[in-house]
Amino acid sequence: MANIYQGEGSCWAQNEKIYVPGSGIDARSARGILSLIERELKRGWTYDHSCRKIRMTPALAKRRAIYLIALAKKHRGAAEARRVAELVYSWLEKHRLLSGAVKRKIAAYVTA
């Protein structure tokens, strides 16, 4: 199972020759991944973990963006997760993907 966005072995690196460097999620890598998700949302497709092309929907983009917060908390701790949550919140707001439920979910990640 390949990483979709991060690392030299990621799906993006293999197929697009672009990837987010490093391992683990911090604010810098989250910003890079959000920009790749944005590109996928515009073109209408993405990769799954087997590097096959699949449809990119707003719902999938939202799930992937929110998951960055959980990964940041796991890899770097609560303080970095809060910074990533702010980025994700702004990104979701910019793309009109922010709802009350999503706000609560982001708040739960940051406070838990």
Residue spans for each PLM region:
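Arg/Lys-rich, low-complexity, intrinsically disordered basic segments
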Residues: 1-112
